[in-house]
Amino acid sequence: MNHIRNFSIIAHIDHGKSTLADRIIQRCGGLADREMEAQVLDSMDIEKERGITIKAQTAALQYKARDGKVYNLNLIDTPGHVDFSYEVSRSLSACEGALLVVDASQGVEAQTVANCYTALDLGVEVLPVLNKMDLPQADPDTAKAEIEDVIGIDASEAIAISAKTGMGIDDVLEQIVAKVPAPRGQSEAPLRAMIIDSWFDSYVGVVMLVRVVDGRLQKGERFKMMASGAAYEANNLGVFTPAQQSRDALEAGEVGYIIAGIKELKAAKVGDTITLEKKLPNNLGPATEALPGFKEIQPQVFAGLYPTEANQYDALRDALEKLQLNDASLHFEPEVSQALGFGFRCGFLGLLHMEIVQERLEREFDQDLITTAPSVVYEVVKGDGEVIMVENPSKMPDQGKIQEIREPIVTVHLYMPQDYVGPVMTLANQKRGVQMNMQYHGRQVMLTYELPLGEIVLDFFDKLKSVSRGYASMDYEFKEYRPSDVVKVDILLNGEKVDALSIIVHRSQSQYRGRAVAAKMREIISRQMFDVAIQAAIGANIIARETIKALRKNVLAKCYGGDITRKRKLLEKQKAGKKRMKQIGSVEVPQEAFLAILQVED
């Protein structure tokens, strides 16, 4: 046990985390040279393309240190994005050490800081590493100062490396051996293992990635999940060196996989504790208490996904079910919209998660989708005191029946160079933000705001990047539900509500947003044979109106001269025809209209 080192790598997107992992695996001979490919641990195409890691992966490596001993290094690759923060915290709690990789040419970024604090809270030893030292613009001294200022850990011994050229990799491995503590666990205690991650393999079922904390699990033993109580038999265990290697047992302190013929991912929840099912003569029986930190993940952002062709509904459901096999945090339920037909209401962890799910549906399953505006969950207290959760604007009860609406508030940390503080503060105030704190760290500034999640969901991130020329970064965490004066704005076409176009906004912005959406619709919906009235309404109050004028034929073209009554007769006849058409005609709402709501400028 003293020769095991479990560590992970914390880094911002594109600071070289996966490249460093590749180098470490290569140095320890985890894969033959012919199997080495760039970003070995990122197995999904979309992970490689976006340069992000979504699912955790591991590699168990043997390293012969300078002191002549052989150490088992377990590298646990973590996702780096704030949407996947729960998965990050589980990956980190399975480690005793973490390499904090900072791009020497860019300095510290928000996501890194958030994950680094998570690591420090969990008592993980953090070793700073400066990457990209081969670049001419690398500035190690500033980067070290930033690490000390922003994160508050000693960076004087930060290791200078270049993952691309392979410089300094041995120093990193030596530091891991020297500074990362060995796992603390009792091999003679009842089995307790934590699920770090789980994914679905179409051949063997669910594969669980676990960190054994106490005791041991042998092949063929029956174990149970402490959160759900379900029991299974361990058909196959082993470790990844990234390639799969079977073993007969997993011991305390090790990180490996268990395959137990589980059919669905919901059964193997990330963060759950595994223990033995019952006491037998040759084992120590089940543990009494679970490992701390397990929680059910709640989706924060909802959107409707509809197939463009009605006959693609079943295909979309199959695609979502397949995605859910590998993504337990994706929720969906069937939904019917008058405007868009049959589809699904999907729940996501955040905006990146939503984009990735959409992109995977389009890319891996060839789906053509219509996506409605993302919305958040509101707590609504009805007149009779009943509290309901509303995740879809069209489900919001009538104004008269509502006592109060509470919206989700999040704490947002914004990091940026000090030149951009002004514009960023203006943006946060526009979004109804309340400033809580402001700290200067050298040239970097950290602003802390409380903002309604509903304001962040639409376009806050894009705006933040544009006002700060891409330098600002953010992370957020849910704080509480708070009473707020929000209203539902409906869009009516010729007096008919279009449910998929409803939005929930703060009353102070409702007039403006209603007008903007109506104006946008007027540009998008094509002219019909009759007048189309586009109205925005709150309850029964119309707050904005635009009219799309009818196309009309010049019925007077064939009258030369002649009496006015003759012309009037023809015009009246045309008018009556248009009126009749308006009663029976319906307006086609093009696909762009649903997306236009997202782009209404504030």
From Swiss-Prot:
It is found in: Cell inner membrane. Keywords: Cell inner membrane, Cell membrane, GTP-binding, Hydrolase, Membrane, Nucleotide-binding, Protein biosynthesis. PROSITE patterns: G_TR_1, G_TR_2. Residues 2-184 form the tr-type G domain. One of its GO terms (cellular component) is plasma membrane. GO terms for biological process: positive regulation of translation. GTP binds at residues 14-19, 131-134. InterPro entries: EF-4, EFG_III/V, EFG_V-like, EFTu-like_2, G_TR_CS, LepA_C_sf, LepA_CTD, LepA_IV. SUPFAM superfamilies: EF-G C-terminal domain-like (SSF54980), P-loop containing nucleoside triphosphate hydrolases (SSF52540), Translation proteins (SSF50447). The keyword RNA-binding does not apply. One of its GO terms (molecular function) is translation elongation factor activity. It catalyses: GTP + H2O = GDP + phosphate + H(+). Belongs to the TRAFAC class translation factor GTPase superfamily. Classic translation factor GTPase family. LepA subfamily. Required for accurate and efficient protein synthesis under certain stress conditions. May act as a fidelity factor of the translation reaction, by catalyzing a one-codon backward translocation of tRNAs on improperly translocated ribosomes. Back-translocation proceeds from a post-translocation (POST) complex to a pre-translocation (PRE) complex, thus giving elongation factor G a second chance to translocate the tRNAs correctly. Binds to ribosomes in a GTP-dependent manner. This is Elongation factor 4. It comes from Acidovorax sp. (strain JS42).
